[in-house]
């Protein structure tokens, strides 16, 4: 018989840097989950990724207080900022352009995020990433 699901907890945690402080501690503590067990498992799973990169994670908490979790790919905005070499997007994206990205960089990001995105082809996923880039004030070249 399958375990009874008590809750789903969605968080963004820095790769390799999960610790019991907020946001992890309070979110898991109120569900009765062993926080250190999650932190060790998460850090082990994300040790191959760039340290500090925000990773979305969905934690399934069961009635017996056990848990499983699924890590996703980093948000497109984070990958775009890294590709363009900027700290943050534009506050006025239609007027102020803060950087440039090429179609090759967008294709690479779309391929990285392919598993977490909807869209039949890589081209449709690229269009989605291009839209995110434009809304951040980035110029798409190519």
Curated annotation (Swiss-Prot):
GO terms for molecular function: large ribosomal subunit rRNA binding; structural constituent of ribosome. One of its GO terms (cellular component) is cytosolic large ribosomal subunit. The keyword Thylakoid does not apply. It comes from the Bacteria. The keyword Ribosomal protein applies. GO terms for biological process: translation. Keywords: Methylation, Ribonucleoprotein, Ribosomal protein, RNA-binding, rRNA-binding. One or more lysine residues are methylated. Forms part of the ribosomal stalk which helps the ribosome interact with GTP-bound translation factors. Part of the ribosomal stalk of the 50S ribosomal subunit. Interacts with L10 and the large rRNA to form the base of the stalk. L10 forms an elongated spine to which L12 dimers bind in a sequential fashion forming a multimeric L10(L12)X complex. Belongs to the universal ribosomal protein uL11 family. This is Large ribosomal subunit protein uL11. It comes from Histophilus somni (strain 2336).
């Amino acid at each position: 018989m399958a375990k009874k699901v008590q809750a789903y907890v969605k968080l963004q945690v820095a790769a390799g840097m999960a610790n019991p402080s907020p946001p992890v501690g309070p979110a898991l503590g109120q569900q009765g989950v062993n926080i250190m067990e999650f932190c060790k498992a998460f850090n082990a799973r994300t040790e191959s990724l760039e340290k500090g990169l925000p990773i979305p994670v969905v934690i399934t908490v069961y009635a017996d207080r056990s848990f499983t979790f699924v890590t996703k790919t980093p948000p497109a905005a984070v990958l775009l900022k890294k590709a363009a070499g900027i700290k943050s997007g534009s506050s006025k994206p239609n007027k102020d352009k803060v950087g440039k990205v090429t179609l090759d960089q967008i294709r690479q990001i779309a391929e990285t995020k392919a598993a977490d995105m909807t869209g039949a082809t890589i081209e449709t996923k690229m269009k989605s990433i291009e839209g995110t880039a434009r809304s951040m004030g980035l110029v798409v070249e190519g």
